[in-house]
Regions:
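Short, Lys/Arg-enriched segments at the junction into DNA-binding effector domains
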Residues: 6-84
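DNA-binding patch around the recognition helix
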Residues: 14-42, 80, 133-184
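Short interface patches used for recognition in eukaryotic signaling and trafficking proteins
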Residues: 52-55, 120-128
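Short, Lys/Arg-enriched charge-dense amphipathic segments
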Residues: 107-120, 127, 172-184
Length: 184
């Protein structure tokens, strides 16, 4: 499969939509406790990929906003199932800030600064100069997931063109406290 995805045009020839049903992976979001050694205490919720044999791999991105972005889509897919769709960062500003606070335990004003950097690039005077780092965070997500499971197996685990995770909703397990989020 890895060879196929490297061939020019192969992604147009093969129907990758069925990969979500065939994926052996699960996404799990757990509340941090001191038994979880892969994450430090900064993380109140931890994302793991679990393979078909039950081995868990911690999912850590280079940027914390990418971690929250990915978690938004995990929660959305787990709670809305097949109705999950693209999530507007601007429409979900308050939900994103609340999620950031929940995941990292920081005050509202700090989480809001993270959101502003995410959605906009600001000058020293606080004025919007251009769009934010959304594309950088998507690339961070793609690279991290691919490094854990490989290119072909990463397809249903990435945020694709449709704007949602293609992994089947029953393969996503989240802590019940995260079901309070209502993304749109």
């Amino acid at each position: 499969m890895e060879l196929i995805t490297r061939q020019k045009g192969a992604t147009q020839i093969f129907d990758f939509s069925n990969l979500s049903a065939a994926s052996e992976y699960e996404l799990c979001v757990k509340k941090w406790d001191n038994t979880i050694k892969e994450f430090d205490h900064k993380f109140h919720y931890c994302i793991f990929l679990k393979d078909g044999k039950g081995k868990e791999y911690p999912v850590k991105f280079q940027h914390h906003p990418a971690y929250c972005l990915y978690m938004m889509y995990i929660i959305d897919r787990a709670t809305r199932g097949n109705d999950a769709s693209y999530l507007s960062i601007r429409e979900n500003k308050e939900q994103y800030i609340r999620l950031y606070q929940t995941v990292f335990g920081i005050p509202y004003n700090e989480a809001e600064k993270k959101y502003l950097t995410f959605a906009y690039r600001l000058t020293k005077e606080g004025e919007v100069s251009r769009k934010g780092r959304y594309d950088d965070y998507l690339k961070d997500i793609d690279n991290t997931i691919t490094s854990i499971v490989g290119r072909a197996d990463s397809i249903p685990l990435k945020l694709r063109d449709g704007g949602h995770l293609e992994l089947l909703p029953d393969r996503i397990k989240i802590d019940e406290n995260l079901r309070m989020f209502n993304f749109r």
